[in-house]
A protein has these predicted regions:
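S-adenosyl-L-methionine
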Residues: 1-86, 123-150
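Conserved small/polar residues in nucleotide/adenosyl-binding loops
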Residues: 156-159
Length: 159
């Protein structure tokens, strides 16, 4: 799951458009996945205040509107980051959009992101790469089924 240059441009050009009309006019944009792009625009509208730095980064992709609704705000994630140690290894059992994982990884030594939905993992892989969060391992699994197989960590995050 990635945004191409044409996707990014489309999102910028149509950021304030009526999304229902945009969906209904999908035939005007051959080769563009209009439902996907409309979802990206809708999520960006949702996160403008909640995740300002992610809103500003046009290369980030969002797997689902509900992920944006359920995620921590940047302010909350930054607070959580203050509570951990620099040498810590962390496991985020409910990866979701990856906001907490990203902020915690900026201070932690290593972070494991676990998420059961493949599309969330694809988006997280892309976003963490864009954000240069290179100390995150992504596992696509139900946390309850893999938690006993994971190595010991300093902190297990579950929200």
């Amino acid at each position: 799951m990635e945004l191409t240059t044409s996707h990014i441009q489309f999102i910028k050009e149509h950021a304030t458009d009526d999304l229902t009309r945009l969906l209904l006019s999908a035939a005007k944009y051959p080769g563009m996945d209009i439902p996907f792009l409309v979802d990206q625009i809708a999520v960006r509208r949702q996160i403008r205040e909640k995740l300002p730095s992610w809103f500003e980064n046009g290369q980030l992709v969002f797997p689902a509107k509900i992920a944006a609704e359920q995620c921590s705000s940047e302010q909350t994630a930054a607070y959580k980051q203050e509570l951990i140690g620099e040498s810590w290894t962390i496991c985020d059992l409910t990866g979701g959009l990856g906001i907490d994982s990203y902020f915690l990884s900026r201070k932690a030594k290593q972070l494991t992101y676990i998420e059961r939905f493949p599309v969330y993992c694809e988006a997280a892989k892309h976003n963490f790469s864009v954000l240069e969060a290179n100390n995150i391992t992504i596992i696509n699994a139900d946390a309850a089924q893999v938690v006993d197989t994971l190595p010991a960590v300093s902190y297990t995050h579950l929200t």
